[in-house]
Amino acid sequence: TNPPTGWGSLTDSKWRGKIAFADPAVSGSSYTILCTMLQALTGDNASILTEFAENLDGKPLSGSGDVVRAVGEGRKYIGVTLEETALKGIAAGYDIEIVYPEEGTSALPDGAAIVSGCAHRENAELFIDFLLSSDVQTLLHDSLYRRSICESGANAGTDELKLIDYDLEW
């Protein structure tokens, strides 16, 4: 059987019981993944969610790390999780590969901010500069498998990915 190529494939009944996915009620990443799926696909959202849920056989996993383990240990064929989680699994020795959905995926930023009127603004600005430095961005990539936000950073950007216009207010 050909592996799935996109979000739409995950609603095909041939994958019933073969998909690992963390419970979106307790996993923020799984919630974001579901929102991405629904925004990338056209059709009735209730039907898409129902078909996907049926393919999970009523057994969502307790966390994102469980998704990679289920696939890496051969208990499931497909794992739907974040890129960084999959990369950590590959680094840990699991024989898995990443497939990016043909319909597109999301790339959401993490944030760092300075509180308005804070007592030590100069130190806060220095800390933000430190976080955005090439050294820290390289460390985040090499150790935590996060994409760099710096064009000069390791694995910079998302140019090779097909990204959807993710609606944060959706």
Residue ranges and their predicted role:
Residues 77-95, 144:
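A ligand-binding cleft/hinge motif common to bilobed small-molecule-binding domains
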Residues 1-75:
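Extracytoplasmic ligand-binding site segments that recognize negatively charged/polar headgroups
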Residues 149-170:
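An extracytoplasmic/periplasmic, membrane-proximal ligand-sensing/linker region
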Residues 1, 38, 108-121, 139-140:
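A bilobed periplasmic-binding-protein/Venus flytrap-type ligand-binding module shared by bacterial periplasmic
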Residues 18-22, 78-81, 97-100:
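Structural recognition of the beta-strand scaffold that forms the well-ordered cores
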Residues 17-26, 49-53, 60-61, 92-118, 130-153, 160-162:
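Periplasmic-binding protein-like
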Residues 67-68, 86, 124, 136:
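Short, hydrophobic alpha-helical packing/hinge segments within bilobed ligand-binding/sensory domains
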